[in-house]
Structure formats: structure tokens, C-alpha cells
């Protein structure tokens, strides 16, 4: 079998035309505060970068194994904390995970596939959002139940890329933070870094549960920006900058955030990250077995 070569993650993220808006640079660095057109285009593309519409319903009624998301979520959060990855990386990794799970089934009875998927999603997100990304073996921190060889992770990365149609420049709530903060606070310049940091932290916390999956990325971002800015949702006037949003939906998100910082929607006990016993995967299954199973997954 030919050696797997990792795809060029810088130039081939998705199949959009080359003259489309570069949302990757927007996502990483923020965008000009006057870029209303860019924001409108991002809102139009939200659905392309979201889980399938019935994903939340299937999680709630048991059609999808809810524990799969819990296990992957727990490790991603723990790994990001240990590796000192930021909330942008968490949000992007969870975006990939939810989109993948909404359209692609993992085999039942093979717990290792959940961990491998989590590692692949975090690895892809880190390559976009983080400056210093460790090698794949060093990425697998946090005492995971399984540790995989680099080649196995790379194969899962390729599967994720194909399932997501190479759309990794995802529009998430983080993409709108600076825009909404600037509109709410009337800044002519970038909003205060403290507000941006707090907003990103709150957005990352919303990934811990599933209730926020009901809402669009722009709705979550607007609600978070209003919340951290201390605005009263009933009194705030939704100007033209918010015209594409439904006020009642934004208000509902704000109530969820302000009630308990999203902990009521968290599905991890006491809002903590799950713990997994450490066991090297190579001790239980061969690389050939992993490769064979990954082939069947795709």
C-alpha cells in the first residue's frame, strides 16, 4: 500500500471558487468592521458549515449514540487545555465532529473509532487555528483510552475531509464576534480584547451541550456579544446590522447563557471533562486492523 501523504491543508480546504470570500483569514484575524457584505455572505454560508438539520433531533431521540459525542467532547476539551489551544480551536474541532456525526455513522462496538475521530478533528482544527501544532503522537494527550500511530490518524483525517467535502474554513459563532461587539458598543476600532476573549470563552462553553445546536452560528454570536456587553435583550434595538436575525431566537440563547453560563445545557457531569484510562492502541490492535476498519468506514 502506498504511503499516505497528508493533504495540503493550506490551499485545498473546500471546493469553493477562488474568488469567494476568504473566510479563513476572517476567522483567524477578525475582519474589517465595515465589512457588512462579508458578514452577509458568511450568514448565507452558515448552513454549509453546520450539522445536518435533523442532527439534534436524532441525538435527543436516541437514533444517534449520545455517548459518542460526550466521549469525543471530553477528550477534545481536556487535550486543548493541556496543549494550551484556544477556544477557537475547540469550536472548530467540535464543528467538524458534529458535522461528521450528523452524516456519517461510526460502527457500533468499536470504541476506538470515537477516539480516533476526536483526534482527527482536533488535529485538523489545530492546523488552522494554532501556531504551534505538535506531531500527531504528541497531540494525543490527556490520558486517552487509545493512542494511535500517525498513519492511522492521517487516514481518519482524510475521511473527515471527504465527508465534510473539504469545507474546513467553517463559519462558526467565533467568526462573528468582533463584528457584533463593534456594532453593539459603537466602536470605530476593534472591540476591547477583554470582550473578545470573554465572548470566545462563552462560545466554546456552548459546545459542551447539545441545546445550542438548535441555533445558527450568527444567532449564537449575537447573543454572546450582547451578553458579555451587558445589554438587556428586551431593550436592545436590533438595527440593520442585526436585521438578518430573529430577535426571539437570539433572546432565547441569551437567556440560556445568562441563566447559568450554558451549564444547564452541558451534558458532562458538573460541567467537567470526562476522564479516560490510558491504554496504547497498538497494544490491542495492529495498524493493519485499524487500516482495514478505516477502509470499511469510508
Curated annotation (Swiss-Prot):
One of its GO terms (biological process) is stomatal lineage progression. Transmembrane segments: none annotated. GO terms for cellular component: cytoplasm; nucleus. The keyword Cell division applies. SMART domains: CYCLIN (SM00385), Cyclin_C (SM01332). Pfam families: Cyclin_C, Cyclin_N. Keywords: Cell cycle, Cell division, Cyclin. Belongs to the cyclin family. Cyclin D subfamily. Interacts with CDKA-1 to form a kinase complex. May promote cell division. This is Cyclin-D4-2. It comes from Arabidopsis thaliana.
Amino acid at each position: 500500500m502506498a504511503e499516505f501523504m497528508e493533504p495540503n491543508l493550506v490551499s485545498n480546504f473546500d471546493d469553493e471558487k477562488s474568488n469567494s470570500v476568504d473566510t479563513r483569514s476572517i476567522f483567524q484575524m477578525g475582519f474589517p468592521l465595515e465589512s457588512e457584505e462579508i458578514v452577509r455572505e458568511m450568514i448565507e454560508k452558515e448552513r454549509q458549515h453546520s450539522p445536518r438539520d435533523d442532527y439534534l433531533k436524532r441525538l435527543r431521540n436516541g437514533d444517534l449514540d449520545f455517548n459518542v459525542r460526550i466521549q469525543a467532547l471530553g477528550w477534545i476539551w481536556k487535550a486543548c487545555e493541556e496543549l494550551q489551544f484556544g477556544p477557537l480551536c475547540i469550536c472548530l474541532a467540535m464543528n467538524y465532529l458534529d458535522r461528521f456525526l450528523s452524516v456519517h455513522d461510526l460502527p457500533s462496538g468499536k470504541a476506538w473509532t470515537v477516539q480516533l475521530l476526536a483526534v482527527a478533528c482536533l488535529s485538523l482544527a489545530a492546523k488552522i487555528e494554532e501556531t504551534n501544532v505538535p506531531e500527531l503522537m504528541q497531540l494525543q494527550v490527556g490520558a486517552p483510552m487509545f493512542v494511535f500511530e500517525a498513519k492511522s490518524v492521517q487516514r481518519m483525517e482524510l475521511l473527515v475531509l471527504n465527508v465534510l467535502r473539504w469545507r474546513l474554513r467553517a463559519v462558526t459563532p467565533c467568526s462573528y464576534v468582533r463584528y457584533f461587539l463593534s456594532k453593539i458598543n459603537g466602536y470605530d476600532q476593534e472591540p476591547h480584547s477583554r470582550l473578545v476573549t470573554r465572548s470566545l470563552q462563552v462560545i466554546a462553553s456552548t459546545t459542551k451541550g447539545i441545546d445550542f445546536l438548535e441555533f445558527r452560528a450568527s444567532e449564537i454570536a449575537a447573543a454572546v456579544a450582547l451578553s458579555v456587553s451587558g445589554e438587556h435583550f428586551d431593550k436592545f434595538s436590533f438595527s440593520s446590522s442585526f436585521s438578518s436575525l430573529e430577535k426571539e431566537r437570539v433572546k432565547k440563547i441569551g437567556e440560556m447563557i445568562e441563566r447559568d453560563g450554558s451549564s444547564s445545557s452541558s451534558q458532562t457531569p458538573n460541567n467537567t471533562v470526562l476522564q479516560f484510562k490510558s491504554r496504547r492502541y497498538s497494544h490491542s490492535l495492529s495498524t493493519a486492523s485499524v487500516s482495514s476498519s478505516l477502509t470499511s468506514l469510508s
